């Protein structure tokens, strides 16, 4: 039992090492890798090579598939080139399996030692993340060595020998067991290595080993399908296409396993080495043969998985790519783009508010819907940012993280205020057949125009971080407050003059002035984040 636990822990260490390498590479080169993938879609050979290269870096075809599916889900990459990239990823992971199974036991402690020094010394820097990659590679090599050590006593047990001795006849059953190995270990590499070790120990025959390798490849396709089961239709098509390619390859090669085994037996190499080489060349030949059929497979997948009908009319997040969370700069940029979409919705709310002020009560319903849309986007941004490893962010990234969440919160609060303003105008003015005085409506329009201008400038400052624009926004905030105070006094003067319309709408009018003042403060608060003024808190607190 203890030996089995050692094997399971070694497999877990292999998966964890792969995760650490992927995380480190994505944080250092994530944006560049995405650029490579997105720009390699014009020609199939480029897409194929991009899949190989990216997978070699991130140590996982599943990670590359996740990146590609996120692109397809956002309509950044078409399905056909995405399938070609995934085929390249399968070749890349097979090549890395060959490299990692060389005798590199001396390299493991060196990589871990140097990696820890860099990672702990400069954790949030580029060098620190490269140290993380070194730790991950060292753990992978250590895990591979531990797997070999753990399997050896297991293979000597009589019960295990009896179980594996039964794997001699049914090639389909052998392939399914290989797929099960890959799913249980969450890694086709671990399954292939286990197969090679069992072959070297003489526990399983060489033909059975080839079937297990073929099944392990199929299992990795099933894993990708399971990982994307909750994704949208576009992302599921990529996973389905990858699985079908592997299924077709398995069905084609399985009948020829015994002739291939007899042919490879003539090579003067250890059986364990032959298993690894078969894994490499099988994936290489299969993927190269499938590339010309990528477009046909894309059409088939679109027929099988159709676009889902849009039942929910609410605005939905478009840029919150989960696979970008390992690349903080990219994830923050995605969240910022989503905040800009909230800004667009806020502009629509401002336009609707003006229509309500001018006697169009139907717009009040549209304001409620837009407020719900803003809340949906704000919640999505908040949850997305909460999934980022905030403790590992660099100082600048941490500041930007706080800036994004604060801006999203301010806009969400502003949307609630605008929704309430529209409702109060409809209830107190339009329903009661009361109208603002001509002078009062002009003043509200002037404040509205200034407020809309400040909102647009605030979104520009938020996205660009331009100091000059931030200073201009701060000045605009002060001008708005002066104008708001002047119009409040003007309204009181009209009350002294016994203006009937002003008297009837007085509480509503003054309430709108106060709400606009609060909106202005919420919009303009981003200026202080950029300028980092010492009197920031004092200025923000004044409404």
From Swiss-Prot:
Its main location: membrane. InterPro entries: Na/Pi_transpt (IPR003841), NaPi_cotrn-rel/YqeW-like (IPR004633), PhoU-like_sf (IPR038078). It catalyses: phosphate(in) = phosphate(out). The keyword Transmembrane applies. It is a multi-pass membrane protein. GO terms for cellular component: plasma membrane. Pfam families: Na_Pi_cotrans. SUPFAM superfamilies: PhoU-like. The chain crosses the membrane at residues 1-21, 76-96, 99-119, 134-154, 175-195, 196-216, 238-258, 274-294. It is found in: Cell inner membrane. Coiled coil: none annotated. GO terms for biological process: sodium-dependent phosphate transport. GO terms for molecular function: sodium:phosphate symporter activity. Keywords: Cell inner membrane, Cell membrane, Membrane, Phosphate transport, Transmembrane, Transmembrane helix, Transport. Belongs to the YjbB family. Might be involved in phosphate export. This is Putative inorganic phosphate export protein YjbB. It comes from Salmonella typhimurium (strain LT2 / SGSC1412 / ATCC 700720).
